[in-house]
Amino acid sequence: MIRVKVPATTANIGPGFDSLGIALQLYNIIEVEEINFGLEINIPVEDQAYIETNEHNLVYQAMKRLFDAVNIHPKGLRINLINNIPIARGLGSSAACIVGGLVVANELLNNPLKKEEIIYLAATMDGHTDNILPAFVGGLTVGSLLEKEVKYVKMDLPTQLKLLAIIPDFHFSTKKARSLLPKNVPIEDAVFNISRVGLLVASLVTSHFENLSEATKDKIHQPYRKDFIPYWEEITSKLMKIGTKGYFLSGSGPTIMGILDGDYKNIEDEMVNFLSHFDQGYKVTVLDVCHNGLEVINDEGSNGCYR
């Protein structure tokens, strides 16, 4: 049996629309083995309303993409999915399925494709690199999907940096979130974001966290999506008052992320108490950065072959 462990991801990080992403220490596990015939997909009972267990399953679709690419098809498959990444919450659940499915398929066939080839397949399936890249390689990534390849850079983040995830109890699809965006943006808004992307990346990598309250600002996507996030203004205002260094909408939402530097317990507890007074359910959790990305797990533990 082949096992892969795929991290959650948070994308955009404010101004880095469709290009920046960070891997998080929250994981899905995918287990696959070849069987004599058919397709068997096993998922937890609580996920059965949201995840298909037939050929439309996204993990299987990713596996099939690789099988078709190399023209090798197993007789049958048993796929076990252990899902810890919340679905449709802006934490890269779809990217985890795509990345994990491609890698587990590659492993099943004794690795006919190189990592860069798999990354390209994943990015073409997802349409963007912002969640795909950190799921593969960990850390902070910036990338571009070109006609025949993906260009990217991975950067290590300071170990004291953590993310405070405020996860609503409702789904918000990427398709719906994209439908809220304008077809065109004013040049001054584009310049606003471009200037802050550079400041954001440099500040994160060099621990200049004092810049993050400004560097995470955005005029391209968050202004159009925030009205669909209950209590956005109240939550983000509270985040800054209690000591987070900056905040942003995670991916297309609805999760809101606060950036933490070091000690966080009082901030986490205060946020839980604050949110308990609203009529919208939220889960608050502190997540460490996943520095290594996806891992293939064998009987002796991780072999780390995709780092």
From Swiss-Prot:
The disulfide bonds in this chain are none
**Chief localization class?**
cytoplasm
What PROSITE patterns does UniProt report for this protein, alphabetically?
GHMP_KINASES_ATP
The record ties this protein, via Pfam families, to: GHMP_kinases_C (PF08544), GHMP_kinases_N (PF00288)
Its recorded reaction(s) are: L-homoserine + ATP = O-phospho-L-homoserine + ADP + H(+)
User: Could you tell me which InterPro entries the record lists for this protein?
Assistant: GHMP_kinase_C_dom, GHMP_kinase_C_sf, GHMP_kinase_N_dom, GHMP_knse_ATP-bd_CS, Homoserine_kinase, Ribosomal_Su5_D2-typ_SF, Ribsml_uS5_D2-typ_fold_subgr
- GO BP terms, alphabetized: threonine biosynthetic process
Q: Which residues does the annotation say bind ATP? A: P86, I87, A88, R89, G90, L91, G92, S93, S94, A95, A96
Q: According to its UniProt record, in which pathway does this protein act?
A: Amino-acid biosynthesis; L-threonine biosynthesis; L-threonine from L-aspartate: step 4/5
Protein EC = 2.7.1.39
Instruction: Give the keywords, sorted.
Output: Amino-acid biosynthesis, ATP-binding, Cytoplasm, Kinase, Nucleotide-binding, Threonine biosynthesis, Transferase
General function of this protein = Catalyzes the ATP-dependent phosphorylation of L-homoserine to L-homoserine phosphate.
Entry similarity comment: Belongs to the GHMP kinase family. Homoserine kinase subfamily.
Q: What is this protein called?
A: Homoserine kinase
The major lineage groups are:
Bacteria, Thermotogati, Thermotogota, Thermotogae, Petrotogales
Protein's gene: thrB
